[in-house]
């Protein structure tokens, strides 16, 4: 019969299931002005086997947010070096993130008269915790040294959730419960936004909302 819809809006992770019903994106749209600054990675997730089936509208990226007044502070850098023997800088691994978050957890390091904490994260069950866990696990389970699928083995479709990468990430996340604010293990996205955006933590990672909140005059 006749297809009831001309356009379908949905997540790119369903693209292989949907593509039998979809027409490739017309070249005039692929070459449009709006597409000029779309990154190759976002074009890639909108495509299957080299053919673009979806037109990206939301990058949906996770960002690392950090307190510049701490990380870039020479006095804090000196203190951190003296106490830990390590360099205080923007972390590039989850291990560095955890070490710094743990060090800055539970004391008033910005002089506002209140305790600050290491990290605000979405940890609430049945909320968006799955997305937060993927950000942690992808560094171990999907990188140039771990080719193939992320969720499944591409040859056998065996779930990868119990592989060393996911297990390592889960261990990190259990450790992270020690450097979040009180009640942090029940933080949903709104709580994470309010916590980092309100100046309560050194780090957070998720979408850009908490960064925007941190830029407000009352933060």
Predicted stretch roles:
Residues 10-65, 72, 132:
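Hinge/lid segment of periplasmic solute-binding proteins
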Residues 112:
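Acidic carboxylate motifs that coordinate Ca2+ or other divalent cations, activating on Asp/Glu
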Residues 1-13:
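Early extracytoplasmic/lumenal segment of secretory-pathway proteins
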Residues 27-38, 78-90, 109, 124, ...:
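Short, solvent-exposed loop/beta-turn-alpha elements that line the ligand-binding surface or hinge
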Residues 96-103, 132, 136-186:
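Glycine-centered hinge/linker elements that transmit conformational signals in sensory
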Residues 45-46, 50, 69-70, 74, ...:
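Extracytoplasmic/periplasmic substrate-recognition and gating elements
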Residues 161-219:
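Ligand-binding pocket segment of bilobal, Venus flytrap-like solute-binding proteins
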Residues 1-4, 71, 96-104, 190-204:
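Short helices/loops that flank or line small-molecule/ion binding pockets
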């Amino acid at each position: 019969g006749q297809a009831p819809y001309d356009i379908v809006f949905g997540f790119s992770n369903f693209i292989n299931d949907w593509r039998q019903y979809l027409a490739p994106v017309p070249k005039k749209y692929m070459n449009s002005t709006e597409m000029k600054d779309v990154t190759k990675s976002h074009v890639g997730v909108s495509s299957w086997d080299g053919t673009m089936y979806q037109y990206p509208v939301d990058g949906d990226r996770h960002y690392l947010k950090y307190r510049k007044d701490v990380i870039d502070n020479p006095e804090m850098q000196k203190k951190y070096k003296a106490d830990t023997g390590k360099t205080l800088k923007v972390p590039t691994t989850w291990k560095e993130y955890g070490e710094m978050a743990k060090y800055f957890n539970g004391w008033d390091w910005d002089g506002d008269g209140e305790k600050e904490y290491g990290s605000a994260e979405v940890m609430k069950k049945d909320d968006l915790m799955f997305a937060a866990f993927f950000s942690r696990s992808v560094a171990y389970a999907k990188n140039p040294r771990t080719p193939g699928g992320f969720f499944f083995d591409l040859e056998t479709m065996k779930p990868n959730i119990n592989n060393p990468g996911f297990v390592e990430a889960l261990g990190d996340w259990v450790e992270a419960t020690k450097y979040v604010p009180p009640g942090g293990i029940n933080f949903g996205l709104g709580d994470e936004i309010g916590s980092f955006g309100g100046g309560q933590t050194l780090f957070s990672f998720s979408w850009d909302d908490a960064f925007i909140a941190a830029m407000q005059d009352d933060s």
